[in-house]
Amino acid sequence: MDFLVYHRDRPGSGDLRRALVEEHWSYMDGFAETMIARGPTFDESGEVLTGSVHVLGLPDPAAAWRFAFEEPSYQAGAYRDVLVRRFRNDLGRTMWDFAGGRDGDDRYLVIGWGPAPGTEPVVPDSDDLIGCGALLSDDGETWLGTAVLVRAAGLDAAREVLAGRRYDAVEVHRWHFGGRRTEDQG
């Protein structure tokens, strides 16, 4: 089963996050085979780290919580909170399959929270989708929202990916492809 784990930074933790980047990557290396998407989020300026999102396959909710709470930056106090949700990979692929490449400052994480459990919308239709899926209850039975990784011309354009659908709230975060870069990735 797949999960979205979004660690959100506490204010002023950027230096700590940068100091722990190698420990973070080493920890994530242990989950590389099951990783669907990963990467840091930033404020509107694109300069200040605000979090770290991971979408990956794990055996059960308990394993997802262990993944979230054993992460080195979490253990060191860099994060203010963590969101752990079951995830349905509606695109059926990983971020590395995205034809638009991994470079660019025009990538975003968009999370739409549903108005009432069970009113699930359709998957947005766009060649700019890097990742997309339903956020679900722990038992996987109830739709709670939608998470999208998208290439867009700006924050407003990213928000439009979920426009016209029924959401109580939509949050948009600048996002970059994460993980170690190998020679063939640039």
For the regions a protein language model found, what residue spans apply to each?
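Conserved, structured core segments of small domains
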Residues: 1-186
